[in-house]
């Protein structure tokens, strides 16, 4: 704005030879520093990026019961997907509902997740081979365990500083883990 105002003043009080140059600058379209979304390389990526270096705190599972999980002091009801600094609801009912699409959130992140710990409820269940194949093709290891052991494994890997995710289904029935000072109602 200040530059344009300076050119206007210069244009009005110009000598004849400077006029053509200033006139051409004044009337030519200029985009300046503004970029359209197509010009910006970061706009063209198709991945989501949730990890940030400014927030180095990790996600830890405090407790779980048949209704859900307590993660960093916050209650999450039902199945959930844990990312290095984020928790999201996971829309699966049982291990049989787990598909490639339900795991897609784990391979969209950057930096890439090294390992995904899957908790399948009270006992360890097998996943479809296509799901495991898709994760292997993307370079992500999958560890399938019952939910109590998956919670412990996830906390251990986070404590080690590994870039890990978890896909957890709450164990049915009365199986529960409460951290000190919490009840398992």
Curated annotation (Swiss-Prot):
Q: Does the keyword Nucleus apply?
A: yes
Matching InterPro entries, A to Z?
MTH938-like_sf (IPR036748), NDUF3 (IPR034095), NDUFAF3/AAMDC (IPR007523)
Return any one Pfam family short name: DUF498
Instruction: State the GO CC annotations.
Output: mitochondrial inner membrane; nucleus
The GO biological-process annotations, alphabetized, read as: mitochondrial respiratory chain complex I assembly
Among SUPFAM superfamilies, the record links this protein to: MTH938-like (SSF64076)
Q: Which UniProt keywords apply?
A: Membrane, Mitochondrion, Mitochondrion inner membrane, Nucleus
Sorted alphabetically, which CDD domains does this protein's record hold?
A: Mth938_2P1-like
Q: In which tissues is it expressed?
A: Expressed in testis.
The compartments listed are: Mitochondrion inner membrane; Nucleus
- Subunit relationships: Interacts with NDUFAF4, NDUFS2 and NDUFS3.
Which PANTHER family does the record associate with it? NADH DEHYDROGENASE [UBIQUINONE] 1 ALPHA SUBCOMPLEX ASSEMBLY FACTOR 3, NUCLEAR PROTEIN E3-3
Query: What protein family does this chain belong to?
Result: Belongs to the NDUFAF3 family.
Report the protein's function. Answer: Essential factor for the assembly of mitochondrial NADH:ubiquinone oxidoreductase complex (complex I).
Protein's recorded name = NADH dehydrogenase [ubiquinone] 1 alpha subcomplex assembly factor 3
- The gene that this protein is the product of is Ndufaf3
């Amino acid at each position: 704005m200040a530059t344009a105002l300076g050119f206007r003043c210069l244009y009005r009080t110009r000598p004849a030879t400077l006029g053509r140059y200033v006139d051409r600058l004044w009337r030519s379209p200029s985009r300046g520093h503004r970029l359209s979304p197509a010009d910006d390389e970061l706009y063209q990526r198709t991945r989501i990026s949730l990890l940030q270096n400014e927030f180095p705190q990790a996600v830890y599972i405090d407790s779980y019961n048949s209704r859900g999980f307590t993660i960093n002091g916050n209650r999450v009801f039902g199945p959930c997907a844990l990312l290095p600094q984020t928790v999201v609801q996971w829309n699966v009912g049982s291990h049989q509902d787990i598909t490639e699409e339900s795991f897609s959130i784990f391979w969209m992140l950057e930096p890439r997740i090294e390992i995904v710990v899957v908790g399948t409820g009270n006992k360890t269940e097998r996943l479809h081979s296509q799901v495991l194949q898709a994760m292997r093709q993307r370079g992500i290891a999958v560890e399938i365990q019952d939910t109590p052991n998956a919670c412990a494994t996830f906390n251990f890997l986070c404590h080690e500083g590994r870039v890990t995710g978890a896909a957890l289904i709450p164990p049915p029935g009365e199986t529960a883990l409460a951290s000190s000072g919490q009840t398992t109602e």
